[in-house]
């Protein structure tokens, strides 16, 4: 039976810390060594991760005046992601900055090039400040990915996806949950937000993976989830299906969540009929669309602010979906709620 990825088990924030000074590296190195040893990571890969971590911290301190953070994530496919996100001025010449010897602060200039060489995958997004009045985010996001298995299945599937899920104040219980399954040329997912937050919200969204195994349609999944959530706190949800064989997308949802479809440099924002699964809701809102060679679909809980579009993040939606999820989650997340983003892409 094909595995169903579960954000509660497969998408975990293992470390999160501000990088105000070079001393931030001490705690990060200690955490990295403990985690990689526990996971049985080879000595060579562990050393590569430590070197990348050092470069990321150094970049944040030198180029963003310490206005940044470093995160370590465990993600589906048995991978570890080192993420650097800062609120600096951005990189004026990204291509040049990745060439050894290039430096804007009179250093040896080996940072970005070394990060790309030492990691299994590396993705970089940057946005510059254009004026003093500019209100949108500026800075740089770097994702360095390390595969703990020899081979990545993502490259062969035709799909790429990224998950971001954090509980309120990074506490133990998270009412937001994402289930995702790949079946041949199909990608299906169920994205839920349990009412409120805490232990009861998490209980409402737990143990729902089987609904992706016994699949009929997005609407049918929501109906069965609705029945299962009776006598719980309840949840709002989105479910979707991407069919590569038919170049078809289907999305259905109930309640205060949003979907965003990016195609040919345009983004469509979708909201759903009000209601709560397990309690009371109106007819489910469904969307069906055909897509071309490049397509991105984003679903988000209400823990992610909605006042953004392509102009806020120019060029972001052509990046790897995991980098998109990290960027939106960290920058647009509300600190007063659980937060989750699911990003799926084709092409």
Short names for language-model regions:
Residues 2-4, 16-21, 223-229, 233, ...:
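C-terminal catalytic subdomain
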Residues 1-12, 57-154, 182-190, 219, ...:
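Conserved beta-strand-loop-beta-strand hairpin that lines the nucleotide-binding pocket
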Residues 156-175, 222-230, 257-288, 292, ...:
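PP2C/PPM family metal-dependent serine/threonine protein phosphatase catalytic domain
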Residues 1-51, 155-181, 310-311:
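Bergerat-fold GHKL ATPase/HATPase_c domain
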Residues 145-195, 200, 206-207, 280-282, ...:
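N-terminal entry segment of metal-dependent catalytic domains or homologous docking segments
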